């Protein structure tokens, strides 16, 4: 039996690059789609948010001279591109899914509402939420927190390239140690880079647990759903 009934899966755009420096790696995309299919077949209701950093990042764009609002809007469009790619990959292996956008852009995707999303998930469709919150100055992590809270998810699963939360960046500090679980309060007091401050505070205020794990290891998503402790749980 699955550990959670309804999840919000957050994937980073950068992870879709695989070993490339830009864009979408077809093999990585297929790996993700197969993992999502495994969990969907367990009867889990799945909502997904994907970042757009493999294509464009609004904040870095503003640092290069772009207007911040325009830059963030470009970033929102990047998340739509990634969402369409994942939708196509899921459809290719028989997973029914729906792309919902925070900004109206039919026929690319349907305009998001909580009720539309829940109805689709209860009918067995995977919902992919794109275009962030539809507003500038909000990260896709914050968008993930918002969507997770709105759809009444049991947990936000944050798929990353590391196997949890550490005292420091394990890719830079070999002495960093991993937390099996940690409170929202400690994440904030330690200044750990799990998600941005707004996203963490939203989860804390609405009691949405966060589970950070390595999505790049094939099979890990199913392991999380089966109850294996392979990441870090953030909770009250």
What are these regions (language model features)?
Residues 1-236:
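C-terminal catalytic "cap/lid" subdomain
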């Amino acid at each position: 039996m699955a550990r959670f009934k309804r999840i919000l899966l957050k994937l980073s755009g950068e992870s879709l690059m695989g070993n490339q420096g830009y864009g979408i790696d077809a093999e990585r995309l297929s790996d993700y789609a197969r993992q999502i299919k495994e969990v969907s077949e367990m009867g889990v209701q799945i909502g997904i948010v994907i970042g757009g950093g493999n294509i464009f990042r609004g904040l870095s764009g503003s640092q290069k001279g772009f207007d911040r609002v325009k830059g963030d809007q470009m970033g929102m469009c990047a998340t739509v591109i990634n969402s369409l790619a994942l939708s196509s990959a899921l459809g290719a292996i028989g997973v029914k899914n729906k792309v919902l956008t925070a900004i109206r852009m039919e026929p690319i995707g349907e305009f998001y509402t909580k009720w539309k999303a829940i109805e689709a998930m209860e009918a067995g469709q995977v919902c992919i939420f794109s275009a962030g919150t539809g507003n500038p100055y909000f990260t896709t992590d914050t968008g993930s927190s918002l969507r997770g809270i709105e759809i009444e998810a049991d947990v936000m699963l944050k798929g990353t390239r590391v196997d949890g939360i550490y005292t420091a960046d394990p890719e830079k500090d070999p002495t960093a140690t991993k937390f099996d679980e940690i409170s929202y309060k400690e994440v904030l007091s330690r200044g750990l880079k799990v998600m941005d401050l707004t996203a963490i505070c939203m989860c804390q205020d609405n009691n949405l647990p966060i589970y950070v794990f390595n999505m790049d290891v094939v099979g890990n998503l199913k392991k999380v759903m089966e109850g294996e402790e392979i990441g870090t749980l953030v909770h009250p």
